[in-house]
Amino acid sequence: MLAIEQAAQAHPWTRGHFASALAAGNCLLGLMAGERLLGYLVAMPGVQEAHLLNLAVAPESQGQGLAGVLLRALALWARGQGAACVWLEARASNERALRAYRRCGFAQAGLRRGYYPGANNQREDAIVMRLDL
């Protein structure tokens, strides 16, 4: 998982990020092909909602709709937890992710200015998206 995270993310989570997220009781969903991990997501349950914290697909498996498979699995899990919606934030510059989220029914619900750290001590906006279940 860490290898995919490092290869797929511009600002990857560390082992500590994953450990903290899982210790807090968050959900980890993995997409496997045999013994090979193709992608994963981490989501946080909430009161009648869920929040996508991280999603990555191995670079060699990107462009095959696997993010959509993971997002549909997330929606099923969230419904099972009693959620009415799923929230996420994505970097404004991450057009590929934003397209994938829109294809899966997410709609922009807001903007968080300067939410993410960026290059050269700059900050990057986050697009807040919501999927009603």
Please describe what each predicted stretch is.
Residues 57, 91-92:
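Short amphipathic helical patch at the helix-1/turn junction of helix-turn-helix
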